[in-house]
Each structure stands twice: as C-alpha cells, then as structure tokens.
Amino acid sequence: MDVKHIKDYLSWLYYQYLLITCSYVLEPWEQSIFNTLLLTIIAMVIYSSYIFIPIHVRLAVEFFSRIFGGQHESTVALMS
C-alpha cells in the first residue's frame, strides 16, 4: 500500500471520529480532556470484560448444565 493512501485513510478516520463525537467544536484543551475520559472509559470496559465475562460464562454453563441434566462434577471425576 501507498504511504499517502494510509495517511489519507487515517486522517479520514480521525475526521469521522471528530464528526461522530461532535468534538470538533471543542477547544483543544477540552478535546484532550474528552479524549482522556473516553479512553479511560473504554479501558475500564475492556478490563472489566476481560475479568468478569469468563466468570459469568462459567457460572452460566454450570447453571444450565444442572438444569438440562448434565453430569455432576463427582460423576465426571469418577469417569476419568
């Protein structure tokens, strides 16, 4: 790919970001605060998803396996 094409594409993505978030009307210092808050919120969502989703999936699998008559843990341990 051409370097100019990549640069144009990234500037177009940044322009789309400014339009979607309406942050093009903010002062530069307001934009930096807004971007910092947005990045912090996104980081917290990703971290929380990484920590809590596997736990909830495991609990849901255990719950539904008990409802639909799955084998108990003691039975599985004896069979292996």
Swiss-Prot record:
- List membrane-spanning regions: 12-29, 37-57
Which domain of life, per UniProt?
Eukaryota
Record-level GO cellular component terms: endoplasmic reticulum membrane; serine palmitoyltransferase complex
Q: Where in the cell is it found?
A: Endoplasmic reticulum membrane
**Which residue ranges are assigned to the Lumenal compartment in the record's topology?**
30-36
Example GO biological process: sphingolipid biosynthetic process
Q: Which UniProt keywords apply?
A: Endoplasmic reticulum, Lipid metabolism, Membrane, Sphingolipid metabolism, Transmembrane, Transmembrane helix
Q: Which family does it belong to?
A: Belongs to the SPTSS family. SPTSSB subfamily.
Quaternary structure annotation from Swiss-Prot or TrEMBL: Component of the serine palmitoyltransferase (SPT) complex, which is composed of SPTLC1, SPTLC2 or SPTLC3 and SPTSSA or SPTSSB. The heterodimer consisting of SPTLC1 and SPTLC2/SPTLC3 forms the catalytic core of the enzyme, while SPTSSA or SPTSSB subunits determine substrate specificity. SPT also interacts with ORMDL proteins, especially ORMDL3, which negatively regulate SPT activity in the presence of ceramides.
Q: What is this protein called?
A: Serine palmitoyltransferase small subunit B
Annotated organism of origin = Xenopus laevis (African clawed frog)
